[in-house]
């Protein structure tokens, strides 16, 4: 067969071509998924487990009959690699592709829809042919805020994950700007990585990993070393970091339901102290984790003795007030208000709770509500000079805000008035022009009438 004949045969019967020439991309090498690259992609990276991929495809039965196409819907198909969202052949085949690549896949039934099929379009035990174009892929957004992107190099074992307070052993390698700044084995408690110069993003990611999982983590500044940077490692403020992490082993911390009240109160005292140390060091996210443990342990605790109840209420009040302060520092004002509300639910006249809620509401431009809270602070403690100053700030900010609104609305109304005047002028001009044309036509008409002969032939 000549080259031209081979190309013609490939176009006319691509299924046969893949069957004859396709590369076996299965781990078992059982020829269950065969692949031919039709257009080479760019770069060296291929999708990893958990990556979100964007593809266009055409799907045909082995007889050439089309059963599905993303092109017909005019939108790419999106799925996550290795999560069982698509047939096995796709999880295997698409994971071998580079961005921009177009390939042909031939998929045996055991890697497609098997004996069940997918009626009415795909019969039982059907071998399927796909043409797939990999448009793009990106890592898994762990917290759905873009701050931690995970790309899984090796799947972990089992289904259990470390929890907050779990003892973990990991290997990590940290990079910044292509430079390796940290590489070691380390054991620590999840939520306390900062004590070992490990950024909070690693703690957060570990709660979603399985034993022996190996992944690459892209950390934004919020989940890295933040505004402070890390001089010890030569990390500048607000740096983007890349870590490769392997979770070697872990021992889970006790869950709330596994602890009795006495143990919860003992642990509350310990984590309160840890939270305060983190707060004083400017590690507000880490402090939130510690204070949050107190809430998770004690907020829904019932059947306590009078002594236990007083201790629990004291810990909860301190936790909510401290959480509010952390959220103020983190500029998460809505959460700060919520924590103050809970603190004031325990002690309605709490000076710190009222003041911090007022601060949060002032920063949210809720001037009247903020002023009301600061006035309540003065009712509790008339000597609170800071609250008196904040009332003045509320009045000043409210006045500035109202004046700014008036200017904005005045400018808007001025523009509307100018626009209306312009439209009226255009209408008047149009009317005048129209009347002029009409008068001119009438004059011409009269002139023609005057020139007409008196009689007809």
Swiss-Prot record:
GO terms (molecular function) for this protein are:
heat shock protein binding; peptidyl-prolyl cis-trans isomerase activity; protein-macromolecule adaptor activity
Entry-linked SMART domains? TPR (SM00028)
Reactions it catalyzes: [protein]-peptidylproline (omega=180) = [protein]-peptidylproline (omega=0)
By what means is the activity of this protein regulated? Inhibited by both FK506 and rapamycin.
Q: Can you say where in the cell this protein is located?
A: Cytoplasm; Nucleus
* Ranges for region Disordered: 1-27, 423-457
UniProt TPR repeat ranges: 268-301, 317-350, 351-384
- Which EC number(s) are documented for this chain? 5.2.1.8
Arranged from A to Z, the UniProt key words for this protein are: Acetylation, Chaperone, Cytoplasm, Isomerase, Nucleus, Phosphoprotein, Repeat, Rotamase, TPR repeat, Ubl conjugation
Tell me where on the tree of life, at the top rank, the source sits.
Answer: Eukaryota
Which residues, renumbered to this chain, carry the PTM N-acetylmethionine?
1
* Signal peptide positions (record): none
Which InterPro entries does this entry report, sorted A to Z? FKBP4/5/8-like, PPIase_dom_sf, PPIase_FKBP_dom, TPR-like_helical_dom_sf, TPR_rpt
Q: Which residues carry this modification: Phosphoserine?
A: 445
Modifications the protein undergoes after translation, according to the UniProt entry: Acetylation impairs ability to promote interaction between Akt/AKT1 and PHLPP1. Deacetylation by SIRT7 promotes interaction between Akt/AKT1 and PHLPP1, leading to suppress Akt/AKT1 activation.
Composition bias, Basic and acidic residues: 1-11, 447-457
- The PPIase FKBP-type domain covers which part of the protein? 50-138, 165-251
**Classification via PROSITE patterns:** FKBP_PPIASE, TPR, TPR_REGION
Q: What class of enzyme is it?
A: isomerase
* One Pfam family named in its UniProt record: FKBP_C
> Assembly state and interactors?
Part of a heteromultimeric cytoplasmic complex with HSP90AA1, HSPA1A/HSPA1B and steroid receptors. Upon ligand binding dissociates from the complex and FKBP4 takes its place. Interacts with functionally mature heterooligomeric progesterone receptor complexes along with HSP90 and TEBP. Interacts with NR3C1. Interacts with Akt/AKT1 and PHLPP1; enhancing dephosphorylation and subsequent activation of Akt/AKT1. Interacts with IFI44L; this interaction modulates the kinase activity of IKBKB and IKBKE. Interacts with IKBKB and IKBKE.
> Any extra remark in the record?
The relative resistance of New World monkeys to glucocorticoids is associated with a high level of expression of FKBP5, but is also due to intrinsic differences between the human and the monkey proteins. Human FKBP5 has a much lower effect on glucocorticoid sensitivity.
Can you name this protein? Peptidyl-prolyl cis-trans isomerase FKBP5
Lineage, broadest ranks: Eukaryota, Metazoa, Chordata, Craniata, Vertebrata
State which gene encodes it.
FKBP5
